[in-house]
């Protein structure tokens, strides 16, 4: 899962991009495997290429822009080739260029068969990325809309029911 709060929950800001990317992999290996410099270099180069991360992946993540931090966070979980990817507010706090790059990463994941669940308060983001939209209101599921049913009006009518009980 890629959390909404990348700085507080998703990344170790003092560590480099490459180390952050390999942390879940190292944790899954237990004591059997340590991260080597060769692995760091390979992970950094692959992340720069696959996720268009700008700057050196040797720098602490804290020194990267918000968009590049978010791409590092995506790379961190995608390196494990998940079957399901949950993204909570995937583009919060990033610039328009980084948003477009992140959307492309999400679309490529879906095209490879990864089930992608996007939690977002940005309606345009939801409409642009989704095949189906589950609309909630008051902590309860209201309806699941198919791609053909999804419009901003339909979503808002379900999310903010006015005068209906």
What is each PLM-predicted segment?
Residues 1-165:
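Glycine-rich phosphate-binding loops of nucleotide-dependent enzymes
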């Amino acid at each position: 899962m890629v959390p909404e709060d990348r700085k507080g929950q998703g990344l170790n800001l003092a560590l480099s991009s490459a180390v952050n990317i390999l942390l879940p992999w190292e944790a899954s290996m237990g004591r059997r495997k340590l991260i080597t410099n060769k692995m760091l270099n390979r992970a950094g180069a692959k992340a720069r290429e696959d996720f268009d991360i700008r700057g050196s992946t040797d720098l602490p993540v804290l020194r990267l822009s918000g968009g590049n931090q978010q791409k590092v966070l995506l790379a961190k979980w995608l390196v494990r080739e998940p079957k399901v990817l949950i993204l909570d507010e995937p583009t919060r706090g990033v610039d328009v260029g980084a948003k477009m790059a992140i959307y492309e990463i999400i679309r490529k994941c879906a095209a490879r068969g990864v089930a992608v669940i996007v939690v977002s308060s940005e309606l345009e983001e939801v409409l642009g990325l989704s095949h189906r939209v589950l609309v909630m209101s008051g902590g309860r599921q209201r309806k699941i809309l198919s791609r053909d049913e999804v419009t901003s009006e339909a979503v808002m009518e379900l999310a903010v029911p006015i005068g209906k009980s």
